């Protein structure tokens, strides 16, 4: 259902990137944030094919909650591609804007003892086990390793998300600094599942000049990764958010189903495929599939704000 001709797709994307960056945008090359994940690795590889290794800048932008694997694998990608790369520790900037403090304040409204040595992450209930409500909870781990999960108030949840969103926005500011000084374009890394479902930060990782893989389902990104020779450890690494201090999968935090099932359901919904056929391929019952479809529609409604352009008091006709 999601199989593609990887060679033809790579050739098409590379050709499009050249036309967009060199022609439409009149930039000399591209900046890519390297997270050590599958999406940024594929985008960096595509950009290197399009512009050559001397016209691609890879950025590593860790902070104190980042996994060490992200930097290690990101460096491996840059080394294999032979591209210029820079380490930008955004931790001091995250600290300076008060992101850690604001997150801590919100957490302490539900876990008063939370402090040094503790770790946390946000989690949602798997959609197939839920009653239809996407309720986010906070999981914490104390210095002795004891784990507990508590329900958040709406205000605490929103403040935690708002505070952590600083990280993505500071990374994007850093990307644009280097893009401006080099006269480069910023390449975004969202795939179709993430972009459709709103799994990005407005004016953060959802912002870019070009988005080479935004039309591809996550499953298809993995197909390109294999064709392009992306490092096997990266291809085998489970998708993570790398946002909170506790290790966290994307399905724990947002999608509530493994990406390959979300892809199948989203593809089926987008292409009007009969629900019984989609359910059979995904290994779901019809009621389970309808739960997934309901979740997809709910996230699409929530993502409308993230995709929206600024609203003008008077429409301007000029482009």
Swiss-Prot record:
Protein name: NH(3)-dependent NAD(+) synthetase
Any Gene Ontology CC annotation: cytoplasm
Taxonomic lineage from the root: Bacteria, Pseudomonadati, Pseudomonadota, Alphaproteobacteria, Hyphomicrobiales
Gene (UniProt): nadE
Enzyme kind, highest EC tier: ligase
Pathway: Cofactor biosynthesis; NAD(+) biosynthesis; NAD(+) from deamido-NAD(+) (ammonia route): step 1/1
Disulphide bridges, residue numbers: none
EC number(s) given by UniProt: 6.3.1.5
The reaction(s) this protein catalyses: deamido-NAD(+) + NH4(+) + ATP = AMP + diphosphate + NAD(+) + H(+)
Organism the protein comes from: Mesorhizobium japonicum (strain LMG 29417 / CECT 9101 / MAFF 303099) (Mesorhizobium loti (strain MAFF 303099))
